[in-house]
A protein has these predicted regions:
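Active-site metal-coordination/substrate-binding segment of hydrolases
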Residues: 70-167, 172, 394
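N-terminal helical capping/dimerization or prosegment-like subdomains
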Residues: 1-58, 64-86
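Short, conserved micro-motifs enriched in small and acidic residues
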Residues: 29, 33, 137-148, 231-239, ...
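Acidic/histidine-rich catalytic neighborhood of metal-dependent amide-processing enzymes
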Residues: 123-210, 251-267, 271, 277-285, ...
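Metal-dependent amide/peptide-bond hydrolase catalytic core
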Residues: 238-407
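Phosphate/diphosphate-binding glycine-rich loops and adjacent basic-rich segments that engage nucleotide
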Residues: 197-223, 227-230, 234-240
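Glycine/charged-rich beta-loop-alpha catalytic/anionic-binding loops adjacent to active sites
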Residues: 123-137, 221-225, 345, 377-381
Length: 407
């Protein structure tokens, strides 16, 4: 088994699921253990000039010094350790060589298949080698593929000093999946001119536009009395929840939008007769439309209170991250360098806006422009997740091309 593939299988077998209910940094001890017992020793074994673990924010930082006196940018590469909110216990990665294009049986005992009819993207991988799950867990290629690709590129550069480069840094962080990891990123520990998150999906993705994002909370306040005497008195929070959601634009939801169209999405809801809570996410690429959606959301609460003539709901909105393009548009060197690196590797860059965000969204606003590059992983966050080994190798090639000053 090739070193990168062996590393990927080994890393994905380790449970590093984050926990949004936790108050610790990182949110789970498994991420701490992975960072200190696996990543730090492995980076040191590669031969980096410096490797540290920041116990305050959970980031592993590695540095490979420049090997030339020529003028060259300092470049960073970032990936996250945690996996999404899906079963990550007892992950059993399996390699499929030379995929034949048929349905993939993940688990014969439980009759779990990744079917071509459900996942037409499978046709893009005929003849390539895939890493799949046993159907009972996610894979964790998001983002351990990114980690492995960065490490493989660093290992290659250490072994090939004839490739001249400026200072290279890597950062492996926690809690990206719950949206809190980059909040604690220390840019002073990461002095680079620009960086890349290696956290995209299919071959060729180069992303430098994200959503603007906010979370909305609706606290419902009802009145509970005996149903026999409820007329004119009871206010049922379950009904309030339905009324509030009906005040929002019905077409502006994820299942009816695409491209640069934004949305409001009800993520969770819990009600009893006299109490209730609703959690929403609000997304749009355009800053003005983003602000308009937040205002509409807040107005829905006021409207519901006016209907009842009393405060039956309390609505709040909190911004989460912003569109990195607002920063990167004035710092396009990082995009142009990545495009050239992909083209040198025989890859056509695919520059579509992300219908989501990355750690790079926040890090860009901290002063380090940070676009996102593909990993070769698809069907994220579930049992049908898979990684394409061939495309992972291409990601490594792109990273090496990015830092090579002899373009």
């Amino acid at each position: 088994m090739e070193p990168m593939v062996e590393r990927f299988v080994r890393y994905t077998s380790i449970n590093t699921r984050s926990n949004e209910e936790s108050t610790t940094i990182p949110s789970t001890q498994t991420q701490v253990d992975f960072a200190t017992n696996v990543l730090v020793p492995d980076l040191k074994a590669i031969g980096l000039d410096e490797v540290i673990y920041n116990r305050e924010n959970g980031f592993v930082i590695g540095t490979l010094n420049a090997n030339t006196d020529a003028k060259a940018p300092s470049i960073g590469f970032i990936a996250h350790m945690d996996t999404a909110d899906y079963n990550a216990e007892n992950i059993k990665p399996r390699i499929i060589e030379n995929y034949d294009g048929n349905d993939i049986c993940l688990n014969e005992e439980h009759q779990i298949f990744t079917r071509r009819t459900d996942f037409p993207n499978l046709k893009n991988y005929i003849g390539k080698s895939l890493v799949v799950t046993d159907g009972l867990t996610l894979l964790g290629g998001d983002d351990k593929a990114g980690i492995c690709e960065i490490m493989e590129a660093l290992s290659y550069l250490v072994a090939h000093p004839e490739i001249k480069h400026g200072k290279i840094m890597c950062a492996f962080g926690p809690d990206e999946e719950i949206g809190t990891g980059a909040d604690h990123f220390d840019v002073k520990q990461f002095p680079v001119d620009f960086a890349y998150t290696i956290d995209g999906e299919s071959l060729g993705q180069l992303e430098y536009e994200t959503f603007n994002a906010a979370g909305g909370t609706v606290t419902l306040k009802g009145v509970s009395v005996h149903t026999g005497t409820a007329k004119g008195i009871m206010i049922n929070c379950a009904k309030l929840a339905m009324q509030f959601d009906a005040l929002l634009p019905g077409a502006a939801v994820p299942e009816h939008t695409c491209g640069r169209q934004g949305f409001l999405m009800l993520m969770s809801m819990e009600t009893q007769v006299d109490t209730g809570k609703m959690n929403y996410i609000i997304r749009d690429h355009d800053k003005e439309l983003f602000e308009a959606k937040k205002a509409f959301f807040l107005q829905a609460g006021q409207t519901l209170n006016e209907i009842y003539g009393r405060e039956v709901c309390e609505v709040s909105v909190k911004d989460q991250y912003y569109n990195m393009y607002d920063i990167i548009k004035d710092n396009m060197e990082c995009v142009n360098v990545a495009k050239a690196a992909m083209e040198k590797a025989g890859i056509t860059p695919i520059c579509d806006p992300i219908r989501g965000g990355t750690d790079g969204s926040k890090i860009s606003f901290m002063g380090i422009p940070t676009p996102n590059i593909f990993t070769g992983v698809e069907n994220l966050h579930g049992r049908h997740e898979f990684a394409c080994i061939d495309d992972m190798k291409k990601a490594v090639e792109v990273i090496v091309n990015i830092v090579n000053i002899e373009k």
